[in-house]
A protein has these predicted regions:
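N-terminal hydrophobic/helix-forming segments and targeting peptides
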Residues: 1-314
Length: 314
């Protein structure tokens, strides 16, 4: 277990915003190569680990490895960096955060700033911050000094946060969405590697889910693999927190077991199979209604080629 947690921490701490997943992907593939028979990466940045490549049917297990981040859009004459969002952010959480700029030759620390509250009008104090109003300060005094640090427009940025342990055998990390899914699908085939199944099983750490339309890199990976069935592992909302409407989202407690999606991209036969296995193994689970898109890799995978029966576990 300690070895598993060590790998999970290494994976969670690796920088890998959408479109720049190379660091996190390298960590995942290095671990996969210790037991998987076939390890690869494609042009999109999807990483693959396969077992029993001649087996049948072909089962695809997918968890996206990218995280939300930021990207430099402009460097002004005073050396401040202006930013845009990679993926969906609440800009309020960005103010004052320490960040790491993934520069060409080095990782550069910085801090996100905004106009001091003392300088705001009363009306401005009540307004929510917008990302375009924020900047990153790396300590430079000019644009030339920023350039000398190896920083360029387009460089990605992540929060400077490592995984931490919380009470109740829980953890927190900036990249749990969805590095945890990439971890789970790899651990699943690790468990299978000691006693190979009849099926061919491929774990995929997919790229660009946070910014992808209709499945991001998952669509490209499913197109290549042509699986007979796919199971996507992603995160969802825990509703045992304040101010959440259970009538809309359902009742899903942290630690209450997996959440199985039903509807839209989730094939009913795969849902029934997953729920039956959970009941046979006495694994508690809840059901999440997904009448439209799931906003996960399942949306892209299930419509690939002639269609792929897909399940979604959160």
């Amino acid at each position: 277990m300690s070895q598993d947690i060590s790998f999970l921490k290494q994976l969670l701490d690796a920088a890998g915003p959408s479109g720049f997943e190379v660091r996190a992907g390298r960590v995942w593939r290095t671990e996969a190569s210790t037991f998987a028979g076939q390890v690869d990466v494609d042009a999109t940045g999807n990483s693959f680990a396969g077992l029993n490549v001649s087996g049948s049917p072909h089962v695809m297990l997918a968890g996206h490895i990218d995280e939300i981040g930021l990207q430099i859009t402009h460097v002004d004459e005073e050396g401040y960096l202006y930013i845009a969002e990679i993926g969906g952010w609440d800009p309020q959480v960005l103010v004052g955060q320490r960040v790491t700029i993934l520069g060409k030759s080095a990782e550069v620390p910085g801090v996100i700033g905004k106009k001091a509250v003392h300088l705001m009008t009363p009306d401005d104090r009540d307004k929510a911050s917008k990302t375009r109003q924020l900047w990153v300060d790396v300590g430079a005094s000019s644009r030339d000094e920023v350039v000398s640090l190896g920083i360029r427009v387009g460089d990605p940025i992540v929060l400077a946060q490592s995984m931490i342990h919380l009470a109740g055998n829980r953890i927190a990390s900036r990249a749990i969405d969805n590095r945890i899914g990439a971890f789970i699908v790899l651990e699943a085939i690790r468990m299978l590697s000691d006693n190979l199944p009849a099926a061919r099983v491929t774990a995929v750490a997919t790229a660009q889910e946070e910014i992808g339309q209709s499945g991001g890199g998952a669509r490209a990976s499913a197109y290549q693999l042509e699986p007979d069935v796919a199971i996507v592992v992603d995160v969802t909302f825990s509703t045992d927190v304040p101010d959440v409407e259970k009538k809309e989202l359902g009742e899903h407690r942290l630690g209450g077991g997996p959440v199985l999606s039903r509807g839209s991209a989730s094939h009913n036969s795969v849902f029934e199979m997953l729920s039956s296995v959970a009941e046979e193994e006495e694994i508690p689970y809840t059901i999440q209604a997904s009448p439209r898109s799931t906003r996960t890799d399942a949306d892209g995978i299930h419509l690939t080629r002639g269609g792929v029966p897909t399940g979604l576990i959160s």
